[in-house]
Amino acid sequence: PLRWEEGNQTRIMDWLPDDDENILVMIRMSNARSPDVIKLNVKKNSIKTVKKGVAGVGYWMTDEDGRVRIGNTYDRNRSSGSIIFQEEGSTKWRTIWDYSSFGEDSVSVLGFGKEPNKVWYEAYKDGRIAVFSADISKQNIEPELVYSHPKRDVETYLRYRKDKKDPIGIG
C-alpha cells in the first residue's frame, strides 16, 4: 500500500509499544507540503490515515498513548513557526507558541509524559537552551525549569524507561 516516490520521505514517529501490529508513520500522501500520519499494520501490510496533512504543518508528534497532539508549523516567508496543540478529547487545534526561526523565542517540544497535557520542551534561558515542562492545556502556560546549565546549551532529548510514560532524564 505504501509506494516509493522520489523525494517523499517517510519517518517512523511512534513505535506504539503497546501494539504489536502497528506503527505510526509520517508520509506526504494527501498534501505535498505536509505529512499525513498513517497507522501501518506491519503484519497485514495495510494502512489507515490517522491525521491528514494540514497546510503549513511540517511535523507531527504523538503523546505517550499514540495520539497525534502536537504539530509544528513553519512560514518560510516570515521565517517564523508555531506549535499547535490538540487537547485530549477535543477535535480543535490551537496555537500555543509562536516564535521566530533561529531566535531566542524559539520552542521545540521534546515529548509528553504520563499526564496527557504535560510536555517537556526546549527553549532559551539566559542565552542558552534549557529544558522546561508545562501543562499546555492552560490558556496561560507557566513554564517550569527542569534543567539549565550556566555555561552551555543543554543536550535535549528525553530518556524513557520501557515501562514508564514519564521521562526519567534528559541527555
Task: Please tell me what each predicted stretch does.
Residues P1-G171:
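Beta-propeller folds
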